[in-house]
């Protein structure tokens, strides 16, 4: 079923590119190399990411080979890719097609590159995993430790300055704005020093969630807030330190159409960073 879904997304991307070739012919070489020369979505994605992450020391071809091997050996990653790109289309008001995140959105790029580094970390290739983490951080200004776990349907919006620590767990359908830190307090040096973010959480720009705490499902974290204690499900917290200011309905959030549900993302976008 996942293969069918990603094939449909790929066919839609090919259709959109065929239209844009006529509208923006100056980009024809770009579309050809990034999209049209490839036989599948994952081939295109691995090309785009390897082009950005390669250096004079490790070539684009070698990086692309790593990505292609992972996609071949762990087909479950395809489901994460599908759900991630669908999340961007559903929640980002600036995105109306699958082509945009594939080509242009560094939050999507950083997340999918992290998924490769996470696979490498879990299969014992830690040095290679850390190399990719370093390149992802340098290229996208997004620092995600490869040991962190990130579920599917996650959106990193704008993405600049996001930091996600080693022991972080992020469940499905979470939205994270720019300049967010999910880290430790500096007082605990165990592996259990980082937060757990439950399903459907929205974390506003510049928020810091620190320590071995839990943010409950459907909670909303206001921009610039500092969270040092557990947050119950379906509440909004704001401030320094963060305090509960209202109840929210996660069921309502997920049942509404894009134009309505996006207001929950939009009100948390303000803060430092771009």
From Swiss-Prot:
Its EC number is 2.3.1.30. SMART domains: SATase_N. Its main location: cytoplasm. It catalyses: L-serine + acetyl-CoA = O-acetyl-L-serine + CoA. Pfam families: Hexapep, SATase_N. GO terms for biological process: cysteine biosynthetic process from serine. InterPro entries: Hexapep, Hexapep_transf_CS, LbH_SAT, Ser_AcTrfase_N, Ser_AcTrfase_N_sf, Ser_O-AcTrfase, Serine_acetyltransferase, Trimer_LpxA-like_sf. GO terms for molecular function: serine O-acetyltransferase activity. Pathway: Amino-acid biosynthesis; L-cysteine biosynthesis; L-cysteine from L-serine: step 1/2. Belongs to the transferase hexapeptide repeat family. PANTHER family: SERINE ACETYLTRANSFERASE (PTHR42811). NCBIfam families: cysE (TIGR01172), EPS_EpsC (NF041874). This is Serine acetyltransferase. The gene is cysE.
């Amino acid at each position: 079923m996942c293969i069918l879904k990603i094939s449909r997304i790929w066919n839609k991307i090919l259709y959109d590119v065929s239209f844009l070739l006529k509208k923006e012919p100056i980009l024809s070489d770009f579309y050809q190399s990034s999209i049209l020369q490839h036989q599948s979505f994952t081939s295109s994605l691995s090309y785009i990411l390897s082009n950005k992450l390669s250096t004079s020391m490790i070539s684009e071809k070698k990086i692309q080979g790593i990505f292609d091997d992972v996609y071949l050996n762990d087909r479950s990653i395809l489901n994460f890719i599908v759900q991630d790109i669908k999340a961007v289309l559903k929640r980002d008001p600036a995105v109306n097609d699958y082509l945009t995140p594939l080509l242009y959105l560094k939050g999507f790029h950083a997340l999918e590159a992290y998924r490769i580094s996470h696979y490498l970390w879990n299969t014992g290739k830690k040095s290679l995993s850390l190399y990719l983490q370093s390149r992802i951080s340098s290229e996208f200004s997004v620092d995600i430790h490869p040991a962190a776990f990130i579920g599917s349907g996650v959106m990193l919006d704008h993405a600049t300055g996001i930091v996600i620590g080693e022991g972080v767990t992020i469940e499905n359908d979470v939205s994270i704005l720019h300049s967010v830190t999910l880290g430790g307090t500096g007082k605990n040096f165990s592996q259990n020093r980082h937060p757990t973010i439950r399903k459907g959480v929205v974390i506003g720009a510049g928020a810091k969630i620190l320590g071995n705490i839990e943010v409950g499902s459907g909670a909303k974290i206001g921009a610039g807030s500092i969270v040092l204690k557990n947050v119950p499900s379906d509440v909004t917290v704001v401030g320094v330190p963060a305090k509960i200011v209202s109840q929210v309905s996660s069921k309502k959030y997920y049942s509404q159409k894009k134009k309505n549900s996006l207001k929950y993302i939009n009100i948390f976008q303000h803060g430092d960073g771009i």
